Amino acid sequence: MAQAFCLRHGEMKPLLTNLPKRSSKPRQTGITLVIDKGLSVAEAENLLSVAEPYIDFIKLGFGTALFTQNLERKLTVYRNSRIHVFFGGTLFEAFVVRNQFDDYLRFLEQNKIEYAEVSDGSFRIPLQEKCEYIRNLARHVNVLSEVGSKSENSNATPAEWVEAINSELDAGALSVIAEARESGTVGICRSDGAIREELVLEISKHVPKHKLIWEAPIKDQQAWFIKSFGPNVDLGNIRPDDVIPLETLRSGLRYDTFATFAPMTERPPEPSKMIVEELADNRSHIGTPQFTGNKSVSDQHAKSS
């Protein structure tokens, strides 16, 4: 995990103290799952050059894997950075609805994919049948299942969400992704982007938190989850350009979570004598401004002109 450090009295010290403790890769909690909707190889490399320490999973969204040029090269770029990559669940559904599940397995094998997402957001798969797909896939790859419809008209109850999540975990899913889409307006979210708080809290009562990845593509949603479940909550559908902003939210270095994690005091502490001495030493090396009496620079300039 990259952090900002400064050299003080010959030792490297964290630049900021009392930051929330963040997990490091390979993580079991605090996962950030990024959605790639068609990045080029160069764009993938650029993303990792600045954000690799903070990314755990990358999903090639919906069916984009079928249209990605240099797919093998991009997959290699991600794997070389210790990032788990998988294809969006909609692609799984596209194979299943055409009765091509065996072709899907071959496609995963051909691309050396070690994780697969099983979802039923675009067309309904009965829970028992979906669990059978999970059991089948789990014999070949690591399975992430996704629960929740992509339709705004879905009216599944909290009890139905909990039943589906626990059934899919029992069938062999490593974790369950709670649906919100890349728009953040369905599933665990309302059409205006607000979190369905009662639903989320009810799910969290009955499912281990480390088994849940909450889709939260919008900043306010991310902040809500971090304030509700802590800096190491697992979040998904994060846009590539939001990876570092999300890390600042997790660390309390953005307004939305600043007060949650800052060691607030009534007034800023007085600078320590040691720091004052360091500043004085640094100033002596770069020189000090020269003044004539108590006159300001502008006064001196006016007189000379």
What function would you assign to each model-found segment?
Residues 65-77, 95-102, 122-141, 155, ...:
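Active-site-adjacent beta->alpha loops and helix N-cap segments on the catalytic face
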Residues 8-18, 201-305:
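C-terminal alpha-helical cap/extension of soluble enzyme domains
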Residues 28-41, 61-64, 86-100, 146-160:
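Active-site mouth loops of central-metabolism enzymes
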Residues 2-77:
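Conserved N-terminal beta1-alpha1 strand-loop-helix module at the mouth
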Residues 45-53, 68-82, 103-112, 132-140, ...:
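Acidic (Asp/Glu)-rich catalytic clusters
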Residues 29-35, 56-60, 85-89, 116-118, ...:
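Hydrophobic faces of well-ordered beta-strands that scaffold small-molecule active sites
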